[in-house]
Amino acid sequence: MKKAVVLLSGGLDSTTCLALAKSQGFACYALSFSYGQRHSAELCAATRIAKHMGAADHKIVTLDIALFGGSALTDASIEVPEFKESPEIPVTYVPARNTIFLAMALGYAESIGARDIFIGASSVDYSHYPDCRPEFIESFQSLANLATKAGIEGDRFTINAPLQYLSKVQTIQLGAELGVDYGLTVSCYQANEAGEACGQCDSCTFRKRGFKSAGVDDPTRYQKCVHI
């Protein structure tokens, strides 16, 4: 069976990616990161999801919080803003996060003989993070095949971002078709320890709109309601 490393945050998108990779016949090696994020409830969710969905293995890598300063997701002195339509990169951007995550996933993949890496990045219904764009994914794949023994020997890596051009509605519909239990997931940037979502941040808003427009019951437990 082919192996794939799946970046699993515990959120809606990465869980859909895990389900999709499994549906394509991959033995999935889930990889999560603890980097001082205030929404640590997502790591508990990732553990539940990996077990529930039968991942071949699930590793949680702890990174030095000092690597990720200046973000509302890692710095308690910076408030997570309520949702606002804007083309600007918000304070919830974590410096080079996906680059670091993918680099570690690449090393892990090469070491276990996997040549596919799945990431739930999307450039639709997102917060304009630069490391979610298709240009970034394509460039990282090129790097992966230039920087590894496997790559230069022709055993090439593929960075799979199957949600890249899907809206949140389409992602939820896909997950529903794959039987994803979204009640296990946590997407909120500031979920409490019980995994209850704030209902006001960008991630909550995109998620809530997505379920409503997809016509799928929203299993999320919200602390507050947001009008959509």
UniProtKB/Swiss-Prot annotation:
UniProt catalytic activity: 7-carboxy-7-deazaguanine + NH4(+) + ATP = 7-cyano-7-deazaguanine + ADP + phosphate + H2O + H(+)
Keywords assigned: ATP-binding, Ligase, Metal-binding, Nucleotide-binding, Queuosine biosynthesis, Zinc
EC nos: 6.3.4.20
Binding site for Zn(2+): C188, C198, C201, C204
Position of the signal peptide: none
EC main group: ligase
Transmembrane segments: none
Described function: Catalyzes the ATP-dependent conversion of 7-carboxy-7-deazaguanine (CDG) to 7-cyano-7-deazaguanine (preQ(0)).
Record's protein name: 7-cyano-7-deazaguanine synthase
Source organism (scientific name): Legionella pneumophila (strain Lens)
Gene: queC
